[in-house]
Amino acid sequence: MDLTNKNVIFVAALGGIGLDTSRELVKRNLKNFVILDRVENPTALAELKAINPKVNITFHTYDVTVPVAESKKLLKKIFDQLKTVDILINGAGILDDHQIERTIAINFTGLVNTTTAILDFWDKRKGGPGGIIANICSVTGFNAIHQVPVYSASKAAVVSFTNSLAKLAPITGVTAYSINPGITRTPLVHTFNSWLDVEPRVAELLLSHPTQTSEQCGQNFVKAIEANKNGAIWKLDLGTLEAIEWTKHWDSHI
């Protein structure tokens, strides 16, 4: 997929993997790059605009935990301005198993609600043109880090949700794939809490093993976007990009 002149919405684009992915995206000569984030980062926005002044970059304050109706209001404003949006990237996430409800609200429920909201504008059953969704998940969605079971479960939920979105594409016209980074050196993983403090050194232990940089992850993220494979489960680990096969152990037959 050629990203030239595409309109992209990126939720949580200004930190860690999100920011390095944004740096790569603006190099692809997007037409409009719409950033939705809870906190504005003027320095990061200025940097992105400097990388490629031809890309129209806009920022909207957005908290993924708001009700679906609020998400629809913001998206309507964006669609009214741009007329079309090609890609939605859902990237909001936290890693803190002390905050159980907030972890689920941001990592899973917020992503589902944002996706539900944009279907109002994309769903071909409503006359929409369809669209593409890239959901940032995690390799912990395949195999949990058992010391952070809440985070891992939230990411497994997103992998499952994304797989279902992809299978619904013939009905909705909206395709989807998941982006699953391995352990990446970002502020998110430098300090975080295990569930019930079962392993106080969990962050230290993880970072003692081979990792990847957020720059490597961002580069491979954009390669996955350009590959544009509906239903793909992308693993971005140790600087590599690989589409993995999901093992089926049961089928609903519907």
Swiss-Prot record:
Gene Ontology MF annotations: alcohol dehydrogenase (NAD+) activity; identical protein binding
EC number(s) per entry: 1.1.1.1
UniProt-annotated binding residues for NAD(+): 10-33
Modified residues (N-acetylmethionine): M1
Originating gene: Adh
Example of a GO cellular component annotation carried by this entry: cytoplasm
Leading EC class: oxidoreductase
Catalytic residues of the enzyme: Y151
Pfam assignment, any one: adh_short
GO annotation, biological process: alcohol metabolic process
The organism of origin for this protein: Drosophila lebanonensis
PROSITE patterns documented for this protein: ADH_SHORT
Reaction(s) catalysed by this chain's protein: a primary alcohol + NAD(+) = an aldehyde + NADH + H(+); a secondary alcohol + NAD(+) = a ketone + NADH + H(+)
UniProt protein name: Alcohol dehydrogenase
Keywords: Acetylation, NAD, Oxidoreductase
Binding residues for substrate: S138
Subunit note: Homodimer.
Family in the record: Belongs to the short-chain dehydrogenases/reductases (SDR) family.
Matching SUPFAM superfamilies: NAD(P)-binding Rossmann-fold domains (SSF51735)
Gene3D superfamilies: NAD(P)-binding Rossmann-like Domain
InterPro entries named in the record: ADH_Drosophila-type, NAD(P)-bd_dom_sf, Sc_DH/Rdtase_CS, SDR_fam
